[in-house]
């Protein structure tokens, strides 16, 4: 059977197919991990440790000479994404009730839901797409995307200063595996080549684990509003990200479009913020459902749109990027 070849024909399939399988399992049998326990539970719920190892390998695969490119690319994408979410918050604050719409077709729509869906990029999805359609440096450009993680940026954008404190050691913890891998890969070329091979191997594993955090039933709960909001996230953040990538990041826009998704971790933001500020408690459940739907919609559409855009731009294969950037051997390309 040509299972791998079939998956390769699907845009972002190495990430998307396992993610959908995980979401189906989580929806149909949410207690599977607890029932079997042990190693099976580890594969189903191991998003964080799997991503940690993958993050280490990504760091090891990047040449020291690419540092400037990585920082410029990641800084451009992160700042653009946050700026867009901030502008959306300003506009939404003028058009929507303080704590969201409670009745009608738009019931559940709130500034909290919009900002939570737009200010965090799915770093794993972005990096896996760049591993296919970009360079290693672009794949590693999500090093600064950890700044977006958690409720901090959402709370700052919402004007809730003082309700949450940012602990520097949490940021250090987020980038430490990458930095250790980066150091080892640059100290020893053989280690760089060795760890680089694992970058693609781990993608379906964290895709499956991430899928097991998503319940497909949320689409039914939020209806067309959730789907429309997912499309809005791609359009509203994607266009500025493409422009910024072309004008500032030094790319052709592919990385910008690949960053126009909603992070799975963003689903937790409304509840966390509501715990810190009870005023948001009433709208947190609806906001959570909307953000979860955005995760599903963007996880499906962003790989497809990125593949179409990359083809239109005539992107070279990853191996060609790696040769021009670092003259080093790269992991087998993911089609």
From Swiss-Prot:
Gene Ontology MF terms: 2-keto-3-deoxygluconate:proton symporter activity
GO cellular component: plasma membrane
UniProt KW Cell inner membrane keyword: yes
UniProt source species: Tolumonas auensis (strain DSM 9187 / NBRC 110442 / TA 4)
Protein keywords: Cell inner membrane, Cell membrane, Membrane, Sugar transport, Symport, Transmembrane, Transmembrane helix, Transport
Reactions catalysed, as given in the entry: 2-dehydro-3-deoxy-D-gluconate(in) + H(+)(in) = 2-dehydro-3-deoxy-D-gluconate(out) + H(+)(out)
InterPro entries listed in its UniProt record: 2keto-3dGluconate_permease, 2keto-3dGluconate_permease_sub
Family as reported in the entry's similarity comment: Belongs to the KdgT transporter family.
Cell compartments where the protein resides: Cell inner membrane
Annotated TM spans: 10-30, 42-62, 77-97, 100-120, 141-161, 163-183, 200-220, 224-244, 254-274, 289-309
Cysteines joined through disulfide linkages: none
Top-level taxon of origin: Bacteria
Name of the protein this chain belongs to: 2-keto-3-deoxygluconate permease
NCBIfam families: kdgT
Primary role: Catalyzes the proton-dependent uptake of 2-keto-3-deoxygluconate (KDG) into the cell.
Topology versus the membrane: Multi-pass membrane protein
Organism phylogeny: Bacteria, Pseudomonadati, Pseudomonadota, Gammaproteobacteria, Aeromonadales
Family matches, as HAMAP family: KdgT
């Amino acid at each position: 059977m040509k299972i791998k070849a079939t998956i390769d024909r699907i845009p972002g399939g190495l990430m998307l197919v396992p993610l959908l399988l995980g979401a189906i399992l989580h929806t149909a049998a949410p207690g599977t991990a607890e029932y079997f326990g042990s190693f099976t539970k580890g594969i189903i719920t191991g998003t964080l440790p799997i991503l940690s190892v993958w993050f280490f390998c990504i760091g090891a695969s990047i040449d020291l000479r690419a540092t400037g490119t990585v920082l410029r690319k990641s800084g451009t994408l992160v700042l653009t994404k946050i700026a867009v979410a901030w502008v959306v918050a300003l506009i939404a604050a003028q058009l929507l009730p303080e704590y969201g719409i409670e009745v009608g077709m738009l019931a559940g729509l709130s500034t909290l839901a919009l900002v939570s869906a737009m200010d965090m990029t799915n770093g794993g999805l972005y990096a896996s797409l760049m591993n296919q359609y970009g360079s290693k440096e672009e794949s590693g450009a999500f090093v600064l995307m950890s700044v977006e993680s958690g409720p901090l940026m959402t709370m700052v954008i919402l004007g809730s200063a003082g309700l949450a404190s940012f602990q520097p050691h949490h940021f250090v913890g987020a980038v430490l595996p990458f930095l250790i891998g980066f150091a080892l890969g640059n100290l020893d070329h053989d280690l760089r080549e060795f760890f680089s091979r694992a970058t693609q191997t781990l993608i379906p594993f964290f895709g499956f684990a991430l899928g097991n955090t998503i319940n497909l039933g949320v689409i039914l709960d939020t209806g067309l509003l959730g789907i429309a909001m997912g499309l809005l996230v791609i359009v509203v953040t994607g266009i500025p990200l493409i422009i910024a990538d072309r004008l500032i990041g030094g790319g052709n826009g592919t990385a910008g479009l690949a960053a126009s998704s909603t992070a799975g971790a963003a689903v937790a933001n409304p509840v966390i913020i509501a715990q810190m500020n009870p005023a948001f408690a009433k709208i947190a459940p609806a906001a959570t459902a909307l953000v979860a739907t955005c995760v599903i919609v963007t996880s499906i559409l962003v790989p497809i749109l990125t593949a179409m855009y990359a083809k239109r731009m005539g992107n070279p294969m990853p191996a060609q990027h790696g040769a021009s950037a670092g003259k080093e051997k790269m992991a087998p390309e993911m089609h």
